[in-house]
């Protein structure tokens, strides 16, 4: 099996239930004040950021390990780009923390829940229809997150990426793409969430097992259909033409017994000049996808796009067409060899197993903690204990330190 390496912004159904920030939470009860401090891992601490930034600032010469493969100009461009990205990461992260803190301190979560109840009530759903209210809450919360994150996304795309020559989007294309992503995400997220909440409601004492199995099935289905049905909504995929590169890729795959069936090229150049490669598929039906920006002199997709065959207007077209770009065949094979190495060494299977073990543990602990009314009261829910809010509190806040550490382990494992 192979898990999809890139999801175009679509997250795991459980993880994207709600993202409102991580911060301190305060509550008052019997004249006592309880404080729940969400602990962050060292990876998100200012000390780590300062250490990383110091490396970017002081390493002004090409390290000897890279001297044979990278010139000074390329290294300097990369260093300055990472400096700007580091600064952006700090300020956007700080804003996220402040936003999350204000939401918690001002009672934003119970307020939005009450507003969601009013909206669902006007739609004809009584208070006992908790799932309907939960879906309204989720829609409003993700809309709020998208709107508040928009200025940061715009700055990242049209200031930082533009400054360093990576951005290929127009403003019109950016907004159309963002709206499309939001709609597609809601079409997946809302039905999946409603079914998950229903399973938890009727699952009895062993609901955590059924919920875990459900999310496992959903994850596998999304991995299966993403590249064939979801990704084409955003990007154009065409088979890699016959030639030396395709033959070399097929030979590489054969040499490690990789069951390759097709090789595609995706039009990544309409968004960015960054390049990438990944593979997907289950069992004996695996496919490789190369970004067109990875391939030297490859411009078939850009040419078709400029001729208007995809029906998009001028505002949505990328700004640079038929530009010489990418890597030589040997370099493409090196990039692809890294990805195939994950498969050959069993990283994909190991990652899936570890991920599902982690998911099961989280649902089990959720089953243990969901009955604690004090958790709900700490977030302003004194009379009701909605299942969606419980999922958000436990997965987003209580498990925050655990999630940070396991994410770090996953990254280290894949590297």
What are these regions (language model features)?
Residues 2-18, 31-387, 397, 401-415:
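Polar-ligand-bearing catalytic/cofactor-coordination segments
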């Amino acid at each position: 099996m192979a898990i999809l390496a890139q999801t175009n912004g679509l997250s795991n159904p459980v993880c994207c239930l709600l993202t409102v920030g991580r911060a301190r939470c305060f509550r008052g009860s019997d004249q006592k004040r309880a404080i729940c401090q969400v602990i962050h891992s060292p990876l998100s601490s200012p000390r780590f950021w300062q250490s990383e930034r110091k490396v970017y600032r002081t390493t002004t010469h090409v390290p000897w390990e890279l001297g044979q493969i990278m010139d000074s100009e390329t290294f300097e461009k990369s260093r300055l780009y990472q400096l700007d990205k580091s600064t952006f990461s700090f300020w956007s992260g700080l804003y996220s923390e402040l936003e999350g803190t204000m939401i918690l301190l001002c009672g934003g979560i119970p307020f939005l829940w009450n507003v969601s109840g009013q909206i669902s009530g006007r739609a004809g759903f009584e208070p006992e229809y908790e799932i309907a209210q939960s879906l309204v809450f989720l829609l409003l919360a993700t809309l709020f997150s998208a709107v508040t994150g928009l200025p940061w996304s715009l700055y990242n795309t049209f200031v930082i990426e533009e400054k360093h020559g990576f951005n290929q989007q127009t403003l019109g294309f950016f907004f159309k793409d963002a709206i499309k992503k939001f709609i597609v995400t809601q079409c997946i997220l809302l039905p999946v969430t409603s079914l998950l909440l229903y399973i938890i409601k009727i699952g009895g004492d062993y609901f955590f097992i059924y919920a875990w199995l459900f999310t496992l099935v959903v994850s596998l289905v999304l991995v299966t259909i993403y590249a064939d049905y979801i990704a084409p909504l955003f990007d154009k995929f065409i088979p890699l033409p016959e030639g030396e590169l395709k033959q070399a890729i097929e030979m590489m795959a054969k040499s490690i017994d990789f069951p390759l069936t097709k090789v595609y090229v995706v039009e990544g150049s309409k968004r960015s000049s960054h390049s990438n490669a990944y593979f997907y598929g289950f069992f004996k039906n695996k496919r490789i996808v190369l970004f067109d920006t990875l391939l030297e002199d490859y411009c078939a997709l850009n040419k078709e796009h400029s001729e208007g065959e995809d029906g998009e207007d001028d505002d949505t077209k990328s700004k640079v067409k038929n530009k010489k770009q990418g890597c030589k065949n040997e370099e493409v094979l090196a990039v692809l060899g890294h990805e195939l190495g994950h498969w050959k060494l069993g990283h994909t299977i190991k990652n899936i197993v570890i991920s599902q073990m982690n998911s099961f543990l989280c649902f089990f602990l959720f089953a243990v903690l969901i009955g604690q009314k004090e958790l709900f009261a700490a977030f302003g829910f004194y009379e009701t204990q909605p299942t969606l809010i419980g999922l958000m509190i436990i997965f987003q806040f209580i498990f925050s330190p655990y999630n940070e550490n396991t994410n770090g382990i996953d990254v280290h494992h894949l590297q």
